[in-house]
Amino acid sequence: MQKIDSETEKKFLEAENYRAKKDFRKAIEIFESILEKFPDLPPALHNIAICYTELNKIEEAEKSYLKCLNIEPVSLLSINNLAKLYYNKGQFKKALPILQKSLLKKNDQEIVVEITAQCLFELNLPKDTDLFCRQALKNFPQNKNLKTFHGKNLLRLNKHSEGLKYLNESTGMIEFGENNFKIT
């Protein structure tokens, strides 16, 4: 990463303050002035992307994240935020490979695992969803969202009793039997 001078560091902090105050346009303006001097500064690009996301300027946010990742491809924060951008817009097909890249870098991100399972489910990839959820539940056996996606997916695969088992575990449904009932 580039070393910045103290004047640029002050400008960066000023831009961060504007971003914290939700004055995203002013923050973008200052971050862009920093990029004039340091055109390949990933933190400035990343923060611009965050500001554009908050302003609902998705294409601009995407461009900033992609440029940031082109400079610093290992930035897990930028990878996850780009995936989140696509996910929040329902662009599951675009989000999925980025989420998978994130999990290759760090596989214990429970939220990223959940979102990956949801993307697979929403893309109607039942076999991939089944394999992914089975593996993910080994790592996160108490995760109710994973159990829900796995249960719904098993119903899609016509594995009704197994699917209902996972859905019951995730929702805490009451099961009634002929002679007794139990709360799970």
Task: Please tell me what each predicted stretch does.
Residues 3, 37, 71, 105, ...:
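Structural marker of alpha-solenoid helical repeat scaffolds
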Residues 6-37, 43, 50-54:
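Alpha-helical segment of the N-proximal tetratricopeptide repeat
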Residues 9, 43, 77, 111, ...:
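Start-of-helix register in tetratricopeptide repeats
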Residues 20-21, 54, 88-89, 122, ...:
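Register position in tetratricopeptide repeats
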Residues 33-34, 67-68, 101-102, 135-136, ...:
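Canonical positions in the second alpha-helix
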